[in-house]
Amino acid sequence: MKNILVIVDAQNDFIDGALGSEEAKSRIANISNKIKSFTDGVIITTQDTHQENYLETKEGKALPVAHCIQYSQGWGINIEVAASIIAKAATDPSVSYDSVTKPTFGSTELMEKIASYVGDEDFNITFVGFCTDICVVSNALLTKAAFYERANVYVDASCCAGVTPEKHNAALEVMKSCQIIVENE
């Protein structure tokens, strides 16, 4: 069975930048430990990616906080998370790495990458990252819908943070209702 670890939007703007929080900061060590313990599979990072005209977009009008502007400091993957991925890839030949940039919450490109990686096999996929109630839940539900019979979909709650703790918990409940396995609450 194939294994996938998806690190959703572990970007500076969601940790200590424009949309950062203490909860997100406190999850970085957990994410790094999750990377270090991962074996025999692929690690995929997603990056929320917007352009300079973000505030003029539909999302920008609904969430008027410029964030994750492509190539800005806030768009970058957190240095501790990036270092953990690099160290893992350099020392464990059973682990490969891929990435997806995405302009919206859920990523159809991520679904395509998952499909190309797993082929017709059953697989385990674990989601970690930010924000639990926006991009983590969107991608976990897309995966559950796209690969329902073949995927064991997990979310590690100890490696996620939402916009608020209440929204984080609400998203976890929604995912459990949709038969996503939530671990480490």
Residues of each region from the PLM?
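Active-site-adjacent betaalpha module
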Residues: 2-4, 30-36, 40-41, 65-185
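Short, hydrophobic/glycine-enriched beta-strand segments
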Residues: 3-10, 14
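Active-site metal-binding loops of divalent metal-dependent hydrolases
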Residues: 10, 48-49, 130, 159
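Active-site loop signature of alpha/beta-hydrolase-fold enzymes
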Residues: 13, 52, 161-162
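Active-site neighborhood of HAD-like aspartate-dependent phosphohydrolases
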Residues: 13-19, 32-33
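Short glycine-enriched, charge-decorated loop/helix-capping segments at active-site entrances
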Residues: 17-25, 62-68
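Von Willebrand factor
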Residues: 35-53
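Metal-dependent catalytic neighborhoods of phosphoester/phosphodiester hydrolases
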Residues: 54-59
